[in-house]
Amino acid sequence: MGYKCTRCKQKVEIDYEYTGIRCPYCGHRILVKERPTTIKRIKAE
């Protein structure tokens, strides 16, 4: 699952074995999870 940096807008892969979560490009700590591009269809009853 990919994340996106809120400062530089780069796609970031998270290494969960490393203790700190930061953008490797700019060092910013706020990352948002990218949403999937597919649309989920649910049938209404």
UniProtKB/Swiss-Prot annotation:
Compartment(s): Cytoplasm
GO biological process: DNA-templated transcription
Cofactor(s) needed by this chain: Zn(2+)
Gene3D superfamilies: RNA polymerase ii, chain L
Catalytic activity: RNA(n) + a ribonucleoside 5'-triphosphate = RNA(n+1) + diphosphate
A Pfam family the protein falls into: Zn_ribbon_RPAB4
GO molecular-function term, one example from the UniProt record: zinc ion binding
Source species, domain of life: Archaea
Alphabetized InterPro entries for the sequence: RNAP_P/RPABC4, RPABC4/Spt4, Rpo12
Binding site for Zn(2+): C8, C23, C26
Cofactor binding notes: Binds 1 zinc ion.
Main location: cytoplasm
GO CC aspect terms: cytoplasm; DNA-directed RNA polymerase complex
EC number: 2.7.7.6
Keywords recorded for this protein, A-Z: Cytoplasm, DNA-directed RNA polymerase, Metal-binding, Nucleotidyltransferase, Transcription, Transferase, Zinc
Family: Belongs to the archaeal Rpo12/eukaryotic RPC10 RNA polymerase subunit family.
Function recorded in the entry: DNA-dependent RNA polymerase (RNAP) catalyzes the transcription of DNA into RNA using the four ribonucleoside triphosphates as substrates.
Subunit structure: Part of the RNA polymerase complex.
This protein's name: DNA-directed RNA polymerase subunit Rpo12
Upper classification of the organism: Archaea, Methanobacteriati, Methanobacteriota, Stenosarchaea group, Methanomicrobia
